[in-house]
């Protein structure tokens, strides 16, 4: 039977519920337990797929093609369970399903209410998402006290009562602020946050107290006394210099022992040696490189969360400190390529819309002409093809139909024919709905033997995740190939371009898929590892 750990947050947002939850999951997994994780998002959007990166941050794509919260990226980086569409749902998704059932008449004329219909649907989805795991950690987004979170909190209150105390527990994250003028940490916000929880029928079993200063034993004892939580279940979680230390910090305070005893689970002790190696490699690099990351959402770096983490993982596998120089592509348009001088490699990530595209194209040209290692991802591949068409093939008007629908040389175009779930072909245009209408999820890619990308993966066929609706125009592909563009990766059926490489260049790879979604700190990712190796070679050349 599955045990449930419900995770809530109080006092303020952005306390790190996702990382704390994933770290506990990693310890339980290291004890031989089968673990999964769920994220429940209170916003009314059906999914984050159409939300602005500035508002939501990254949209993490699962293996089965769901557009989900970025916390699922943390989950997959910390545990080896692959997330699916069942591991993340929103208020919008819940209401959509309930209303669809109401329209069909499934409720037999009943008045549809938050309790029981919405809460029942939330509970159903939690149980489904947990599957056959030994332990499921269920993170509720937002902060206790938010109006939006109330149906989710009521649902977990009900589910906790239904399965019993031996199968469900509540872990609450709070802030214990340090007041510099008083020279002490303050426990009152935590006390009030727990009081808010208890007012809706939820008593925490574990408190994880976040702080930027050490929390002494007397403060933890005081928190335990005022919140009815066992003293050993009051966990101090001070800011760490790397998030990959968190499993070790939680384990050192006995959190996993408390959970295992509470659930009556029989399992081995935790072997965190893999995490010790990750932390050692992260904090003790032997080399250093600087890589320019040229994007358009630089005001909120969470928009590139998985990519930034993937570069960190590549640094770990290469024992290299990777310094990312974040450059807004519009700044290149306004200030020129001087911003790129002195870097060891250039990375151009994905994005949508016209703004900043010309700056990305200029960055590609700089990398290609100056033999600087280049990695393009999604839009980063499309602008690489556009740049090649303009400056090598001589098509000065070359573009994507996303940016210029009247270009005579549209080397990138919209996918117009799609197979729906039944296999029927439907036509989509620029005016079609944006939500859920992209090429999404894991798909096969055939690699060309002898190519740079094949040297990285050492495989003929790979599986990577996608999130896009524009592709390289096959009608103009013969001219691009004749001019020297190398097609080193194609879709499983050979119909679509997946990877391109530039001729006469030490390391220039651009891919249509998103490799960052499958990179992990323990295993890294072959493409990012190869990219950092190329940056190292460039650095040594420039030294």
From Swiss-Prot:
Enzyme Commission designation: 6.3.4.2
Pathway where this protein functions: Pyrimidine metabolism; CTP biosynthesis via de novo pathway; CTP from UDP: step 2/2
GO biological process, one term: pyrimidine nucleobase biosynthetic process
Other remarks in the entry: CTPSs have evolved a hybrid strategy for distinguishing between UTP and CTP. The overlapping regions of the product feedback inhibitory and substrate sites recognize a common feature in both compounds, the triphosphate moiety. To differentiate isosteric substrate and product pyrimidine rings, an additional pocket far from the expected kinase/ligase catalytic site, specifically recognizes the cytosine and ribose portions of the product inhibitor.
Annotated UTP binding sites: 13, 186-191, 222
InterPro entries documented for this protein: Class_I_gatase-like, CTP_synthase, CTP_synthase_N, GATASE, GATase1_CTP_Synthase, P-loop_NTPase
Pfam families membership: CTP_synth_N (PF06418), GATase (PF00117)
Binding site for ATP: 14-19, 71
UniProt keywords, alphabetically: ATP-binding, Glutamine amidotransferase, Ligase, Magnesium, Metal-binding, Nucleotide-binding, Pyrimidine biosynthesis
GO CC annotations on file: cytosol
Binding residues annotated for L-glutamine, in chain numbering: 351, 379-382, 402, 469
Family the entry assigns: Belongs to the CTP synthase family.
Subunit structure as annotated in this protein's UniProt entry: Homotetramer.
Known regulation of activity: Allosterically activated by GTP, when glutamine is the substrate; GTP has no effect on the reaction when ammonia is the substrate. The allosteric effector GTP functions by stabilizing the protein conformation that binds the tetrahedral intermediate(s) formed during glutamine hydrolysis. Inhibited by the product CTP, via allosteric rather than competitive inhibition.
The reaction(s) this protein catalyses: UTP + L-glutamine + ATP + H2O = CTP + L-glutamate + ADP + phosphate + 2 H(+); L-glutamine + H2O = L-glutamate + NH4(+); UTP + NH4(+) + ATP = CTP + ADP + phosphate + 2 H(+)
Name recorded for this polypeptide: CTP synthase
Record region (Amidoligase domain): 1-265
Annotated active site: 378 (nucleophile), 514, 516
Record bears the keyword Transmembrane helix: no
Entry annotated with the keyword Isomerase: no
Function: Catalyzes the ATP-dependent amination of UTP to CTP with either L-glutamine or ammonia as the source of nitrogen. Regulates intracellular CTP levels through interactions with the four ribonucleotide triphosphates.
């Amino acid at each position: 039977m599955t045990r449930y750990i419900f995770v809530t947050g109080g006092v303020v947002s952005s306390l790190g519920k996702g990382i704390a939850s994933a770290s506990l999951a990693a310890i339980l997994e290291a004890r031989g337990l089968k673990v999964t994780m769920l994220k429940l998002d209170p916003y009314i959007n059906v999914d984050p797929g159409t939300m602005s990166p500035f508002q939501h941050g990254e949209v993490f794509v699962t293996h089965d093609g769901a557009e989900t919260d970025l916390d699922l990226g943390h989950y997959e980086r910390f545990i080896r369970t692959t997330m699916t569409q069942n591991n993340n749902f929103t208020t919008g998704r819940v209401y959509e399903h309930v209303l669809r059932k109401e329209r069909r008449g499934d409720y037999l004329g009943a008045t549809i209410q938050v309790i029981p219909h919405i809460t029942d649907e939330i509970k159903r989805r939690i149980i489904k998402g947990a599957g056959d795991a030994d332990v499921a950690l269920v993170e509720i987004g937002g902060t206790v006290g938010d109006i939006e979170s109330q149906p989710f909190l009521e649902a977990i209150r009900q589910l906790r009562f239904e399965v019993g105390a031996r199968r469900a527990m509540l872990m609450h994250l709070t802030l214990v602020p340090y007041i510099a003028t008083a020279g002490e940490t303050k426990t009152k916000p935590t006390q009030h946050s727990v009081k808010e929880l208890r007012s809706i029928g939820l008593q925490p079993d574990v408190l994880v107290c976040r702080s930027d200063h050490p929390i002494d034993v007397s403060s933890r004892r005081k928190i335990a006394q005022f919140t009815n939580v066992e003293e050993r279940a009051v966990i101090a979680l001070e800011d760490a210099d790397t998030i990959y230390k968190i499993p070790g910090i939680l384990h050192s305070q006995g959190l996993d022992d408390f959970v295992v005893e509470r659930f009556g689970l029989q399992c081995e002790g935790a072997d965190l040696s893999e995490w010790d190696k990750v932390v050692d490699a992260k904090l003790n690099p032997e080399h250093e490189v600087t890589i320019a990351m040229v994007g358009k959402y630089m005001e909120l770096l969470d928009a590139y969360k998985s990519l930034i983490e993937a570069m960190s993982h590549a640094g770990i596998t290469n024992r290299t400190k990777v310094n990312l120089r974040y450059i807004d592509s519009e700044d290149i348009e306004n200030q020129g390529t001087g911003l790129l001088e002195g870097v060891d490699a250039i990375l151009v990530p994905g994005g949508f819309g016209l703004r900043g595209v010309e700056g990305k194209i200029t960055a590609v040209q700089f990398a290609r002409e100056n033999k600087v290692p280049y990695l393009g991802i999604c839009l980063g591949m499309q602008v690489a093809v556009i740049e090649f068409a303009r400056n090598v093939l001589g098509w000065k008007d070359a573009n994507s139909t996303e940016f210029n629908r009247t270009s005579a040389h549209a080397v990138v175009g919209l996918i117009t024919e799609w197979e729906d779930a039944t296999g029927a072909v439907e036509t989509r245009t620029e005016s079609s709905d944006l939500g859920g209408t992209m090429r999404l999820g894991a798909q096969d890619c055939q690699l060309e033997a002898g190519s740079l990308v094949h040297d990285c993966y050492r495989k003929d066929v790979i599986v990577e995740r996608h999130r896009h609706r524009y592709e390289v125009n096959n009608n103009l592909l013969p001219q691009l190939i004749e001019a020297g563009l190398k097609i080193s990766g194609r879709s499983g059926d050979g119909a679509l371009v997946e990877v391109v490489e530039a001729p006469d260049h030490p390391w220039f790879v651009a891919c249509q898929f998103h490799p960052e979604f499958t990179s992990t700190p323990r295993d890294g990712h072959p493409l990012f590892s190869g990219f950092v190796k190329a940056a190292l070679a460039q650095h040594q050349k420039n030294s």
